[in-house]
Design a protein with these regions (language model features):
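Conserved glycine-rich cofactor-binding loop
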Residues: 10-11
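Active-site helix of classical SDR
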Residues: 118, 154
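Rossmann-fold cofactor-recognition segment
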Residues: 48-64
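Residue(s) in the substrate-gating loop at a strand-loop-helix junction
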Residues: 138
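SDR active-site lid
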Residues: 171-235
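Conserved glycine-rich Rossmann-like NAD(P)H-binding loop of the short-chain dehydrogenase/reductase
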Residues: 24-41
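Substrate-binding pocket helix/loop in short-chain dehydrogenase/reductase
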Residues: 94-95, 99-104
């Protein structure tokens, strides 16, 4: 029986993955900043077949007591087989309109929080003989994306840390899956930070036409089960990842033409 901890579990990809693991009878730990939304997801997970559901609300914009959060999660199900580091925040501002306060907030949520959790979980997983760590990055972590300077930076940074973790601890039984979504129908654009740090408030048209969260969750959970190093999730927008690799000049030109909304 799997024990699975999912951050960013109150909506979108995290919520959809929670339901898939619930249907497998997993023991679930659900974390996000919204206790109310988490309770609703937890209710559905129990109805879907989860053996146990624990709700641990946490605001990742302030990570002062993250060690206590990790300890609570580990103790709740007496160990964790899989952690999905999925919580995140985006933005819709150009470089000029992006304050350093906004950059720091994005980095705190998107980079420092998952890194801190992974570092704190690692010795526990090693003592237990291994474990699986999945982290949600983005195609915006593979090439610069307009109106996403802080967001792209945080996702680029995740690649560096978690690819290193893959290399260092593979032989010790730690499997790291880097999840790279393109456009998926989630609330991330609604809660993205606009100029002044206020929520963007709408789903971007490109995102609205993207893959459903349920379809994304199926791809992601299958990749984690197979121990894949990386999984690309999306549709035609994923072509940019390959264009960047083989035709970087063309990628730079296309990035300038992207409609960022």
């Amino acid at each position: 029986m799997l024990s699975v901890w999912i951050t960013g579990a109150s909506s979108g990809i995290g919520e959809a993955c929670a339901y898939r693991y619930a249907a497998q009878g997993a023991r679930l730990i659900l974390t996000s900043s919204s206790a109310e939304r988490l309770e609703k997801v937890a209710e559905k997970c129990r109805a879907a077949g989860a053996t146990q559901v624990v709700v641990l609300p946490y605001d990742f914009s302030s990570n002062d007591d993250i060690e206590a959060l990790v300890q609570s999660a580990w103790d709740a199900t007496e160990g964790i087989d899989i952690v999905m580091l999925n919580a995140g925040i985006s933005q819709r501002t150009n470089v000029e309109d992006t304050s350093m306060e906004m950059v720091r907030k994005i980095m705190e949520v998107n980079y420092f929080a998952p890194v801190a959790i992974a570092k704190d979980l690692l010795p526990r997983m090693l003592s237990a003989g291994g474990g699986k760590i999945a982290v949600t990055t983005s195609i915006a972590g593979r090439f610069g994306f307009p109106l996403r300077c802080g967001y792209s930076s945080s996702k680029f940074a995740l690649y560096g840390f978690f690819e290193t973790l893959q290399a260092e601890y593979y032989d010790a039984g730690i499997r790291v899956t880097i999840v790279c979504p393109g456009r998926v129908q989630t609330n991330i654009s609604r809660y993205a930070l606009d100029k002044g740090g206020k929520p963007h408030g709408v789903m971007d048209p490109g995102q609205a036409g993207g893959m459903t969260a349920e379809a994304a969750a199926r791809v992601i959970t299958n990749a984690i089960a197979k121990g894949k190093r990386e999984v690309l999730v999306g549709r035609k927008e994923l072509l940019m990842v390959y264009i960047k690799r083989f035709f970087p000049g063309l990628c730079a030109m296309l990035a300038r033409m992207i409609k960022p909304m």
